């Protein structure tokens, strides 16, 4: 009774938190926008200092470049035509990279903004909007979280778990978005010093790499925005689609699984695209497949754990009803037993995983939790010890 009362109290507190803090979750998305604005303002404050240092470096290298060319022509005893041709070539070289130095940061930001708009489909996109998309999906799924005697409690438990997975995954995607935006501001700012290396023919490749880097960051942002928008649209479509009662449980688990897949794709694919643009291999395909398999295993384990908890709760409710309890009391007791058994199994699995118990090393936490839930439902708490040897 103590465990059931504790589980019931935790359940009521959790539902109250979800109900009354939805607006607070939505407001937290604005913090990401404020963070982006602060980083942008701080980066602009350093732009003049770094650009002045890049200009000084550029003209020092340009002077050395012209001096070396003049000494080389003098040693070769070149004619007046050779002097004039070399002078024109050096002036064109220095003039072009001087233009890149002054207009390069503006051009780089224009390229990134253009690719960003392409990824956003001509609309707007920000970390706060991605976070709010996850909140909208979770809010739509909350309509399925209806507990009661005549309600589908298994579907309600799955909906609550899926809501948490969706909010966490989209929060992480928004965090990735913020990190890419910070990389863009800081990378383009610090990379401006590379434009100063365009004053010499020996170091001009560094200035070109700055423009390539800007294009790579733009492609990374475009891919990330496209993934986030497509993923949110698919999840909203699944959450809003009218389905039969027999399919709602599968759809709920599918939403949780797809949100994990969106997070994994948002973590790896934009970096791979940036690496292709810059000519570097960032990640292998097998690494992405491995993490995708881990995400799928996590989603499947969570689904089986929710189903096992629902079965345990149903059995406890039937027992309470047979003992003479009312329908409401039996439903609450069954639901409390389901939540309590799932929480106890997950906590015990996490403890064994943390302390490295025998047999827990090769399995995951959710796998161990499902095994413990099956054992408790079967009426035994662990594996039977082997018989003692009698020598």
UniProtKB/Swiss-Prot annotation:
Keywords for this protein: Cell membrane, Conjugation, Membrane, Plasmid, Transmembrane, Transmembrane helix
Location(s) in or outside the cell: Cell membrane
GO cellular component: plasma membrane
Region (Disordered): 372-391
GO BP term, pick one: protein secretion by the type IV secretion system
Keyword Transmembrane helix attributed: yes
Major localisation: membrane
Presence of the UniProt keyword Transmembrane in the record: yes
Membrane topology: Multi-pass membrane protein
InterPro entries per UniProt: Conjugal_tfr_TrbL, Conjugal_tfr_TrbL/VirB6
Pfam families: TrbL
TM ranges: 12-32, 57-77, 92-112, 115-135, 157-177, 178-198, 211-231, 253-273, 295-315, 322-342
NCBIfam families: PRK13841.1 (NF010415), TrbL_P (TIGR02783)
Similarity annotation: Belongs to the TrbL/VirB6 family.
Protein name: Probable conjugal transfer protein TrbL
Organism: Sinorhizobium fredii (strain NBRC 101917 / NGR234)
Name of the gene: trbL
């Amino acid at each position: 009774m103590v465990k059931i009362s504790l589980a019931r109290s935790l359940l009521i507190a959790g539902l109250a938190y979800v109900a009354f803090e939805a607006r607070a979750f939505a407001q937290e998305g604005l913090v990401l926008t404020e963070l982006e604005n602060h980083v942008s303002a701080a980066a602009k404050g350093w732009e003049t200092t770094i650009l002045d240092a890049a200009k000084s470096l550029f003209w020092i290298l340009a002077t050395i470049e012209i001096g070396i060319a003049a000494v080389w022509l003098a040693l070769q005893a070149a004619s007046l035509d050779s002097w004039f041709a070399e002078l024109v070539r050096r002036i064109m070289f220095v003039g072009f990279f001087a233009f890149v130095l002054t207009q390069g940061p503006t051009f780089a930001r224009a390229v990134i903004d253009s690719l960003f708009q392409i990824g956003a489909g001509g609309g707007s996109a920000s970390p706060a909007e991605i976070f709010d998309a996850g909140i909208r999906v979770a809010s739509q799924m909350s309509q399925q979280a209806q507990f009661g005697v005549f309600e589908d409690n298994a579907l309600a438990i799955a909906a609550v778990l899926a809501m948490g997975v969706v909010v966490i995954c989209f929060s992480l995607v928004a965090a990735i978005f913020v990190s890419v935006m910070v990389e863009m501001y800081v990378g383009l700012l610090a990379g401006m010093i590379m434009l100063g290396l365009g004053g010499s023919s020996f170091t001009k490749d560094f200035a070109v790499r700055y423009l390539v880097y800007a294009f790579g960051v733009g492609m990374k942002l475009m891919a990330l925005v496209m993934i986030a928008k497509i993923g949110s649209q698919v999840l909203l479509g699944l959450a809003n689609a009218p389905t039969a009662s027999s399919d709602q449980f599968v759809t709920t688990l599918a939403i949780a699984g797809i949100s994990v897949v969106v997070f994994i794709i948002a973590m790896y694919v934009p970096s791979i695209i940036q690496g292709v643009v810059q000519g570097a291999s960032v990640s292998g395909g097998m690494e992405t497949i491995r993490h995708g398999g881990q995400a799928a295993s996590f989603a499947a384990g969570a689904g089986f754990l929710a189903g096992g908890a629902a079965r345990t709760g149903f059995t406890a409710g039937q027992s309470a009803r047979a003992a003479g309890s009312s329908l409401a009391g039996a439903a609450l007791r069954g639901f409390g037993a389901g939540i309590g058994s799932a929480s106890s199994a997950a906590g015990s699995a996490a403890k064994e995983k943390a302390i490295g118990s025998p047999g827990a090393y090769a399995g995951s936490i959710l796998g161990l939790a499902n095994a413990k839930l099956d054992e408790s439902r079967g009426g035994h708490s662990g594996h039977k010890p082997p018989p003692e040897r009698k020598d």
